[in-house]
Amino acid sequence: MKETETKKEYDPLVNYHEILGVTPEMIDWFWDNMEKAYYLWAPDEHVSFVWEIPPNQNGHVGAIHIVREVEPPMPEKTLRMRFESPKACPIPLIYSHAVVIGRLAPDAPAVGGEPISYTMHEYEESPTGTRMRSTYMLEKGWTDGAREALSNHNKRESLGFPRFLPQLYQLYQVIKNPKLNVPCCLKYDSKTLEYNK
């Protein structure tokens, strides 16, 4: 690091969830097939979804999606997010599956642009379904109200998975075309921090 560069400081927000009746494999599948279920995940808060770079084009890492959502009582916002490698994760991962998401500025390059902040959803099988830890590495300056709104939104999303994901995942098992039903495994090697093939 050059003397003129400063290490980015983050302000973490962490939630733990128990997701009943949903397997880690279903959640893996969800991330690369979000266009099928984004609105079901948080029906009153998710407004729009589009892939800028879909995962069926070059794989999971590097795929970019743009969403509009509301985190009440905060106003609607647009987020541009890129799936990152577990190696990019700014915190130690503790569960066996992980999706690492970098939030990009609207004008950041698709490849190589430094994320503004990171979101990590890590999860593993539990006796009742899946246990998950959601960590938001937020840029400094978030108000207490904005942090609480994001935390509550995240909890509602996690509670939403059992409502739709097992049924949707099962329905899509008949579609064998990987362009339409994108296979996704986000289990990673704890030593190399690379996704398993």
What is the predicted role of each segment?
Residues 1-5, 185, 197:
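Amphipathic/hydrophobic helical signal segments and adjacent flexible N-terminal regions
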Residues 41, 65-67, 123, 132, ...:
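Generic structural hydrophobic/aromatic packing signal, biased to beta-strands
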Residues 97-159:
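Beta-strand/loop substructures that line and gate deep hydrophobic ligand-binding cavities in soluble
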Residues 17, 80-89, 116-125:
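Hydrophobic/aromatic beta-strand elements that line small-molecule binding cavities or substrate pockets
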Residues 136-196:
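A conserved amphipathic terminal alpha-helix motif
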Residues 1-60:
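Hydrophobic ligand-binding cavity/cleft-lining segments
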Residues 39, 46-110:
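Glycine-rich portal/gate segments that line the openings of hydrophobic small-molecule binding cavities
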